[in-house]
């Protein structure tokens, strides 16, 4: 509006309020002014007239209520002080009302839904108007109809929006610069543009795109974009503790781990794959192997009933297909332990775990799998009844591995620690072998041809122990067993052979005497067992063993070819006769060179079974070593050990020299313990009486040389004391093997001195390998225990017992 001009001058007045559509009452016009009178003053516009009270209410806004302008006509309400009590009361009332459930009727719910929908529509329209104003506001705000001056040329308040948008919805006919060229840059809106909307990568503005990206995925994509343009992170994630994977020729391993893989899909469809639901038990839809097998058998029987000829052929094919399918399905059966599976379901992986559990290792071609129980041994029923009667509940590791091999007529080398059940491991297959041969007492000439089997043992005590164990089975089966050992007259032993014997248990020296004196021949011997072969070599029996093996017939010797590994070929009789191929087995705790030489000469393609590690002590023996020098100090320490009451009888004390046995035995008797001695100078009757007194519990302590270190089975020995350290680590191994037998635990105490420097290194290594033993600091730091000494063969046995021990088996 133009300003009001009076007397050729303009006077600025406050801005007029917007005109109201009010009908004012008619007023009479003022009288005309006189010529000399001054013009009347302008009307006072300081306060507008009050609006009438009967005005109708204003119409509601279409989209949003208009903001009231702050001007001269607004009244500011008087400030009232805040009341804390009122605020607390209102808050409590609001909390109580919110805690109570409020029932809404259907009309109220519809009303709330309509109001919510109206708010959403209003928000959508507001967003659209903001988008449209981003490109139009800057030019539309300079319309000439919007002036910064009032009706009298005075400054006005800043408008709230472009007038073109308030008054007209028509599109402009020309650019704003052409329409308002005079006020082109006047009052230009210098406000910054609104910030852009936050957008996630992968979002589109199309109406039909309903996909969205999660915040984690958007952050991951933003991190990838940042890494692409800002470079890789300088912080290294390398860990020196990370285990490096070894690359082989068949499999290539990268330097990173599986959790460092960045090739995963960001599409949620592939991150959360659908899993198949399995119903019932077994395979999908509840059809297990047992159900499928029963269905296959029913179908096969139906085919056979329908057609005897073609149906039976088709039924066999179906059953074969089902068997193959079952085998294929059991190959991937990894959820059961080998003890829970049937024998036909055992896989190669299960057998490998089984061997690791019992520390079994085998070598040789076509070696059968071990047996898991006596029921899988394929032994005759009569023999199984005897096993149950004797009380063999579970087979030992050497029995599990050796019996299946021996049942296939294979030559065998068994390497096992002492007290592991080797006697039953070779006796049971031996009885099965000779049970298929004719009875030896059938004809007189058969009695004179000698035994079917011979068992060689290094000492008399071990031979008699094997005889006692063998008679538990041979008596009920009707076989005759005879032992030929030194200490008895040849006439007495010849008399025991008058009725013939299927099995002869002998020491090498006495058996050579019988062969040379024509008391015994080996014309039909077809089974040879050498127990404690390394001990026989140590005692100087290598030459007698070779004489015995050379005296065997060559007609039943196995061929040195692949047929020796074929159980079917070795089980056949030779030339349709009753004779069978000779089977040779060797059991030992260590494998010295002489034993390997005998095995290469007389065994044909043998299978090698090793229980544990060769030459190591059993894990059930706790080894203690004490550095004590001098006989008197050792006797005092021995007395303290026996008097402590920690160990119960029987106890074995080993010495190196014969004359020390009686001296130490007298000292033990003075301490109040009963004792007996056992060495090479004792007669056979004295030896048997000494062992019997220890076994029946009448004697507490047995003082012996290395003679009792091999094969002597005294039950429940709780302590072994090495008063003198053995001259070799092999002898030490067999000494401490007298305790901890048959799965029981035991203790071995060794007195060590500077004279035992030759065995200190091997002793330290054995103690370090034992999980329940400890290496003393004196032995660990000793100079002789730091490196293995170089010794000559002549100094291996340089004591009195070694000189006379070679005759113990004669």
UniProtKB/Swiss-Prot annotation:
Its main location: cytoplasm. It is an enzyme of class 3 (hydrolase). A motif (Q motif) lies at residues 372-400. SUPFAM superfamilies: P-loop containing nucleoside triphosphate hydrolases (SSF52540). ATP-dependent RNA helicase involved in mRNA splicing. May destabilize the U1/5'-splice site duplex to permit an effective competition for the 5'-splice site by the U6 snRNA, resulting in the switch between U1 and U6 at the 5'-splice site. May also act to unwind the U4/U6 base-pairing interaction in the U4/U6/U5 snRNP, facilitating the first covalent step of splicing. It catalyses: ATP + H2O = ADP + phosphate + H(+). This is Pre-mRNA-splicing ATP-dependent RNA helicase prp28. Component of the U5 snRNP complex. Residues 1-10, 141-150 have a biased composition (Polar residues). ATP binds at residues 416-423. Its EC number is 3.6.4.13. Residues 86-95, 105-119 have a biased composition (Basic and acidic residues). Keywords: ATP-binding, Cytoplasm, Helicase, Hydrolase, mRNA processing, mRNA splicing, Nucleotide-binding, Nucleus. Residues 403-609 form the Helicase ATP-binding domain. PANTHER family: ATP-DEPENDENT RNA HELICASE DBP3. The Q motif is unique to and characteristic of the DEAD box family of RNA helicases and controls ATP binding and hydrolysis. GO terms for cellular component: cytoplasm; nucleus. Residues 801-810 have a biased composition (Gly residues). Residues 14-62 have a biased composition (Pro residues). The gene is prp28. Belongs to the DEAD box helicase family. DDX23/PRP28 subfamily. Pfam families: DDX23 (PF25430), DEAD (PF00270), Helicase_C (PF00271). Residues 1-210, 778-810 are annotated as: Disordered. It comes from Aspergillus niger (strain ATCC MYA-4892 / CBS 513.88 / FGSC A1513).
